[in-house]
Amino acid sequence: MLKTHSCALTQENIGTEVTLAGWVHRRRDHGGVIFIDLRDREGIVQVVFNPEQSAACLDIGKELRSEYVLQVKGTVSHRPAGTENSRMLSGLVEVVAEGAKILNTAKTPPFYINEEVEVDESLRLKYRYLDIRRQGMKNNLIIRHKTVSFMRQFLNDRGFIEIETPILIKSTPEGARDYLVPSRLFPGQFFALPQSPQQLKQLLMVAGMEKYYQVARCFRDEDLRADRQPEFTQLDMEMSFVDENDMMQLMEDLFTGLVASVRPDMKYNKKFPRISFADAMEKYGCDKPDLRFGMELADITDIGASSAFGVFKNVAAQGGAIKAISAPGCGGYNKSQQEELINLAKKYGAAGLVPISLGAESGELKDLTMEMVKSVSAKYLTLEEIKTIAERSGAKPGGLILIVAGARKMVNSVLGEMRNHLAAKLDLCDKNELSFAFVVDFPLFQWDEEGKRWDSVHHPFTAPLESDLPLMDTDPARVGSRAYDVVCNGYEIAGGSIRIHQADLQRKVFHLLGYNNEQIDERFGHLLEAFEFGAPPHGGVAPGIDRFVMLLAGETSIREVIPFPKNQAAQDLLFGAPSVVDDKQIRDLHIRIQTEKE
């Protein structure tokens, strides 16, 4: 080994002869004595090149520059009094160099590695191997390692078996577009990269494996967001002979144990509340609510219907909804600031937004007067109506009430977006807190207005509630599902369900989704046939590793916790992928590139 110790040296190492190897983090020349900070994965330690100790070492020290790769031999000693550095783990010790060797030189990096300064992301992705040397990225990848290690051990301890499933599979689109791989041996035919191992893990339950998991790579050719990548990693799990409560208890134990192990400094709830899908939409405007703050949506349709405000009366008369949220401390917003919120609501899909300011000064609701109220709608509402709206939305003097009226689905969606926007703007969320919950009682189907057909809310393998089976023929919209999501801080971090395990029921669901028998047999015949050989009741779940590590690391993009991610245009800037390939490779695959003109 070229090193005997890491650079994370402490007082316990004083007097020890060590051989270190790492990168020059900083270099300082103090009039004949050279100091460097030597960095490796574990830490940073000060190394002293003193001519009284070794003139040859000093000559090497003079050659050093940032990011040179260096081996040093020396003895760990106390730093002289007054030179200690409390900001470093090794700040009480130093190594006086007795021997040194430059293992490699380095060009000047395109950005500072020894400073946590903001760097253009494109540059970071192009030089990702340098970016990972920086403290933030290094720590994120260590958190990722600890997370995956805990997950594996947790499931191993509970009798799960890790089984790898194929990456080259049949294309059976599950919502997003597949990544296709042309077959050289079978011209005109294609493999697909898996969007998830969904059918494979269900087949493993038919095979009698009972408890399966894998750290699975998944691929989806979809539009990207901060928490999306074309390839991502999930902890894929499936169990036989379980119900929803069994799976949710497993998830609660997994996530609470994981946080306690990997980030014990973070606050988190050990018991996860269960919120119905309907309640989540009505109270928070989305099915993955951030519960670190309140600002729940308040239904004021009845107040609007009986008020003198024509806009509200018309919406209520047409069966629409009128809802409000309260922005604390925003009562002093001027016209320009309120206009900004109105435009934001329109961007999210509302026809407009009605702000009601309760004055700039804080106080109690009982002391509110009409003189304190500032709103274009104030002349249409009585003081009692405004107080009731304020009471329902949790507003007090000094706050700002925001009201949206229209179709219920739109109202919920717009105010849900406004709620999250205001929470970020007003800094209402504790960044060191993880607020978990289960969202349950999802519908099985949703109507696609554009396609004029039913879609699965989750996926077509989710089991319906047994009590709702008669509704499949008469009212699919009312059929409930046996699905459960784990949400945290406004993100879905795991989605799961009890699965269909009867061939006839699975075929019926496919029919409702618009497949005919020929399409069903061609795409899913292997699964339906397997169900005829004694498929056990089973269920599963798949926590997204990238997304949860993002939350553990306190980041806002999964690109910050993936070693070599694609950018937001799905490009790999380091390797230059996707790229043009050799004509012979194209010909060997029996495919032709069609130009735009064609």
Curated annotation (Swiss-Prot):
Instruction: Kindly report the protein's main subcellular placement as a broad class.
Output: cytoplasm
Q: Which domain of life is it from?
A: Bacteria
Give the GO terms filed under biological process for this record: aspartyl-tRNA aminoacylation
EC annotation from Swiss-Prot or TrEMBL: 6.1.1.23
Swiss-Prot/TrEMBL catalytic activity: tRNA(Asx) + L-aspartate + ATP = L-aspartyl-tRNA(Asx) + AMP + diphosphate
Keyword Transport tagged: no
Tell me which UniProt keywords the record has, alphabetically: Aminoacyl-tRNA synthetase, ATP-binding, Cytoplasm, Ligase, Nucleotide-binding, Protein biosynthesis
List the GO molecular function terms: aspartate-tRNA ligase activity; aspartate-tRNA(Asn) ligase activity; ATP binding; nucleic acid binding
Quaternary structure, per UniProt, is: Homodimer.
The name this protein goes by in its record: Aspartate--tRNA(Asp/Asn) ligase
What species is this protein from? Answer: Dehalococcoides mccartyi (strain ATCC BAA-2266 / KCTC 15142 / 195) (Dehalococcoides ethenogenes (strain 195))
The beginning of the lineage is: Bacteria, Bacillati, Chloroflexota, Dehalococcoidia, Dehalococcoidales
